[in-house]
Design a protein with these regions (language model features):
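N-terminal strand-loop element at the rim of the active site
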Residues: 1-4, 8-59, 143-150, 158
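A conserved mid-protein helix/loop that constitutes part of the nucleotide-sugar donor-binding site
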Residues: 7-12, 183, 187-206, 218-224
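Donor nucleotide-sugar binding/catalytic pocket of nucleotide-sugar-dependent glycosyltransferases
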Residues: 43, 127, 131-170
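Nucleotide-sugar donor phosphate/pyrophosphate-binding loop at the beta->alpha transition
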Residues: 58-63, 100, 109-132
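Short His-centered aromatic/hydrophobic patch
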Residues: 81-87, 105
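Aromatic "clamp/platform" in nucleotide-sugar-dependent glycosyltransferases that forms part
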Residues: 241, 260
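Conserved acidic donor-binding segment of nucleotide-sugar-dependent glycosyltransferases
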Residues: 292-319, 329-333
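A short, well-ordered alpha-helix in the C-terminal region of glycosyltransferases
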Residues: 328, 335-349
């Protein structure tokens, strides 16, 4: 269970339920990043996280058999899975152990798997398997619509991700030893093409401000070289993966997010909980649902920026509009303060106490 949005949600759910239920966590790989209550029963299927995509695909039936053995041994009648490969394994294993399958899709498959052979294989598997699940949980309205329209998934509900707002607030007050020289933007996310950190770096090169980037990933080396190439090492810092990113959020002045596509970007809620004004691309899906909940969820910006109730939305892959939004946030203190005042109000809509009841009705009650 590495660092990531889905993994964080699993940790929140289990830690919240362990006082009421006997909780079991079955991992494909033995890695655990998030803190889990010691009372949670953890087992893993002993898979190698460094396997190639091809090997992971070929081993799906074998891993499904391993899961079915655990299910039969523990006499589980229902298994909940998070993330695409785990969903495949859950559904395939149910043919052997006959348990009910609840799968959770955390991204928009038609966009996430839109390239190459790997994308075609995953689209095929989603179309072939997902509709056979007892229930599919999407974490945004955009994801739900994508699964309905493009993958013929019928038994489907949408439940947003839960957040422990009090814990985030508490962690945000922890001391960190980092120097802040001027107006500072911050972004958090895996260093991959989808998060499009280069767009933020390109935007900030002509702005009198600093940028903190929290996260790790395959593009770390490329981004380090790109920052040096643009001679921005004095204003752009790659801070790596942080166990407590909230203390960095609380020190920054504005959160900026440049993803090309998302499922439900947890970092936007976390930034709201830290009372940060937000600039985000209007990617599918999640940012509009979070920052502009009263607008048409099917609309997507093309040529303009949009000042919403809870932040600024900009078109995807548009460096000029992103730079305009960043300059506006620096120059307009009244606008920044207005977003800050509204942020915690919006974050509270995703409180764990509220969202967990929706999960509990589906997962914990027969």
């Amino acid at each position: 269970m590495e660092v990531g949005g889905a993994e964080r949600v699993v940790s929140v759910l289990l830690n919240s339920w362990v006082d009421k239920y006997e909780c079991y966590l079955i991992l494909i790989y033995p890695n655990i990043f998030y803190k889990l209550d010691s009372r949670i029963n953890i087992t893993h299927l002993n898979e190698d996280s460094c396997e190639s995509r091809a090997k992971k695909l070929l081993r799906l039936p074998l891993v499904a058999k391993k899961l079915s053995n655990v299910v039969k041994e523990r006499n589980f009648n229902k298994v909940v899975s998070f993330l695409t490969r785990a969903n495949y394994i859950n559904i395939l294993s149910s043919y052997i152990s006959k348990h009910r399958t609840i799968i959770s899709e955390r991204a928009m498959p038609s966009l996430q798997y839109n390239y190459g052979l790997n994308g075609k294989i995953n689209k095929f598997l989603i179309k072939f398997l997902y509709h056979k699940a007892s229930l599919c949980i999407a974490n945004s309205q955009g994801n739900k619509k994508d699964l309905e329209d493009n993958f013929a998934v019928i038994d489907l509900v949408s439940i947003p991700n839960p957040f422990d707002i009090e814990l985030i607030s508490e962690l945000s007050n922890q001391y960190i030893d980092i120097e802040k020289k001027k107006f500072t933007f911050i972004t958090i996310g895996r260093l991959d093409n989808g998060k499009n950190h280069k767009l933020i770096i390109d935007a900030i090169k002509d702005i009198d401000a600093d940028l903190w980037i929290i996260g790790d990933g395959d593009l770390k080396g490329n981004l380090q070289n790109y920052i040096k190439e643009l001679e921005l090492s004095d204003k752009v810092q790659l801070l790596g993966k942080k166990e407590n990113p909230f203390s960095f959020l609380s020190k920054a002045d504005c959160f900026v997010f440049a993803s090309n596509n998302e499922g439900f970007p947890n970092v936007l809620i976390e930034a709201l909980a830290c009372e940060l004004p937000i600039i985000s691309t209007d990617c599918q899906s999640g940012p509009r649902e979070i920052l502009a909940p009263n607008t048409n969820m099917n609309f997507q910006l093309k040529n303009n920026i949009e000042l919403t109730l809870y932040g600024i939305l900009t078109p995807i892959k548009d460096v000029e509009k992103l730079r305009k939004s960043m300059n506006l946030m620096i120059d307009d203190k009244k606008l920044r303060n207005n977003f800050k005042e509204c942020s915690i109000q919006r974050a509270n809509d995703f409180r764990v106490e509220k969202i967990i009841k929706e999960y509990e009705e589906i997962i914990c009650i027969d």
